[in-house]
Swiss-Prot record:
Keywords: Signal. Pfam families: DUF1283 (PF06932). This is UPF0482 protein YnfB. The keyword Aminoacyl-tRNA synthetase does not apply. HAMAP family: UPF0482. Belongs to the UPF0482 family. Residues 1-28 form the signal peptide.
Length: 113
């Protein structure tokens, strides 16, 4: 595919005016300056959507935090109950780690130390 010099010059002669015509249309001059306050309908709608999403996730975050706090309180109470059970004057009291309860060795019933 040899392109002769005359074909290259002809192609260049054709493409150069086309490129110049396109470049002049691209660089149009304007004398107007548009200043937006940032308070457009689109930005208000976007802010409303973000607020709605935040509120939805806030409810979910509250549920997760309550569950975490509840589990923490349960573990904390079990730790305190274990200490009370182990320090109990009742010699038949023992701590059951699987159920997190203080049980009587003879009956297997829950006791309060």
């Amino acid at each position: 595919m040899k392109i002769t010099l005359s074909k290259r010059i002809g192609l260049l002669a054709f493409l150069l005016p086309c490129a110049l015509a396109l470049s002049t249309t691209v660089h149009a001059e304007t004398n107007k300056l548009v200043i937006e306050s940032g308070d457009s309908a689109q930005s208000r709608q976007h802010a409303a959507m973000e607020k709605e999403q935040w509120n939805d996730t806030r409810n979910l975050r509250r549920k997760v935090n309550k569950r975490t706090e509840k589990e923490w309180d349960k573990a904390d109470a079990a730790f305190d109950n274990r200490d009370k059970c182990e320090q109990s004057a009742n010699i038949n009291a023992y701590w059951e780690p699987n159920t997190l309860r203080c049980l009587d060795r003879r009956t297997g019933r829950v006791i309060t130390p």
